[in-house]
């Protein structure tokens, strides 16, 4: 890939528009990530689809396929006031101006949201949250259950509630 680009971070989230002429959108980083099959697309899947709209999640999933999509949390610590209309939302961070500043997502919740928003299976979301990120950064010894691979496992129920964690083969 030219210039070493292999991961589109925060895909379609706050990446802006490149406008040369009124009402005409130019090619930006999002289109480049979508167009190039080799580039992974990272997505933040919050409960309301604020970071990435559920329709866009489905489109990106269709474009990138099962092996070039990565779920991320974008988790950060902000404690600004919750704006009107967001009461009860627990996975978004707001700055002190009331603007979205990140998420309070854990990856299990991001997986659950992806399943809800797109119809992805539990197998799909595990791939997006484990196998694909491992491949993207060159960690070939993890991200899947196989002989000779590092035993980092998360035991969940059918709706992604974490029950147990095994790290480097040890129950945590």
Task: Outline where the language-model segments fall.
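Residues embedded in well-ordered beta-strands within globular domains across many folds
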Residues: 9-12, 155, 166
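Catalytic metal-binding/acid-base residues of hydrolase active sites
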Residues: 12-13, 47-48, 76-77
């Amino acid at each position: 890939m030219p210039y070493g680009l292999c991961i589109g971070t925060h895909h379609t989230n706050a990446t802006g528009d490149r406008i040369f002429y009124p009402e005409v959108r130019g090619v930006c980083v999002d289109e480049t990530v979508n167009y190039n099959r080799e580039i992974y697309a990272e997505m933040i899947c919050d409960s309301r689809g604020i970071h990435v709209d559920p329709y866009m999640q489905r489109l990106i999933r269709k474009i990138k396929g099962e092996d070039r999509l990565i779920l991320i949390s974008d988790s950060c610590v902000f404690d600004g006031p919750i704006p009107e209309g967001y009461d009860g939302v627990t996975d978004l961070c707001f700055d002190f101006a009331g603007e979205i500043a990140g998420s309070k997502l854990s990856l299990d919740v991001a997986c659950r949201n992806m399943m809800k928003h797109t119809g992805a299976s539990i197998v799909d979301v595990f791939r997006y949250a484990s196998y694909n990120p491992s491949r993207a950064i060159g960690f070939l010894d993890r991200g899947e259950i196989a002989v000779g691979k590092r035993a980092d496992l998360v035991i969940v129920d059918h709706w992604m509630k974490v029950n147990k964690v095994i790290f480097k083969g040890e129950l945590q």
